[in-house]
UniProtKB/Swiss-Prot annotation:
Family: Belongs to the SecE/SEC61-gamma family.
InterPro entries: SecE_bac, SecE_sf, Translocase_SecE/Sec61-g
Keyword annotations from UniProtKB, A to Z: Cell inner membrane, Cell membrane, Membrane, Protein transport, Translocation, Transmembrane, Transmembrane helix, Transport
Function: Essential subunit of the protein translocation channel SecYEG. Clamps together the 2 halves of SecY. May contact the channel plug during translocation. Overexpression of some hybrid proteins has been thought to jam the protein secretion apparatus resulting in cell death; while this may be true it also results in FtsH-mediated degradation of SecY.
Organism: Escherichia coli (strain K12)
Protein name as annotated: Protein translocase subunit SecE
Gene giving rise to this polypeptide: secE
Length: 127
């Protein structure tokens, strides 16, 4: 039983160490980009991209990173199961939404005009 808890403790320590490495890599990317601003921009950008990719790679090796990858795979599987609308259905729905929006805007414009005239009649102010 104690061997199992020791294994869990070292596993947690390893996880924490991985996250420390991730944060360190990101800090090196940020601080290095700031400190070496006299170096050519494409070279600095390449270094930042490499450091961020390395940080992402280390993050994917953690427990949360593996869970994120599993979630992404499941999400991709679910996206494949979706029955997407055809081009014609999408066009018809878009046209209906545009028409309803136009009608509602005209109704609201008319109501606004009526309310402005009503308020100006009551208050005696002319706009």
């Amino acid at each position: 039983m104690s061997a199992n808890t020791e294994a869990q403790g070292s596993g947690r320590g390893l996880e924490a160490m991985k996250w420390v490495v991730v944060v360190a890599l990101l800090l090196v990317a940020i601080v290095g980009n700031y400190l070496y601003r006299d170096i050519m921009l494409p070279l600095r950008a390449l270094a930042v991209v490499i450091l961020i990719a390395a940080a992402g790679g280390v993050a994917l090796l953690t427990t949360k990173g593996k869970a994120t990858v599993a979630f992404a795979r499941e999400a991709r599987t679910e996206v494949r199961k979706v029955i997407w609308p055809t081009r014609q259905e999408t066009l018809h729905t878009t046209l209906i939404v545009a028409a309803v929006t136009a009608v509602m805007s005209l109704i609201l414009w008319g109501l606004d005009g009526i309310l402005v005239r009503l308020v100006s009649f009551i208050t005696g102010l002319r706009f």
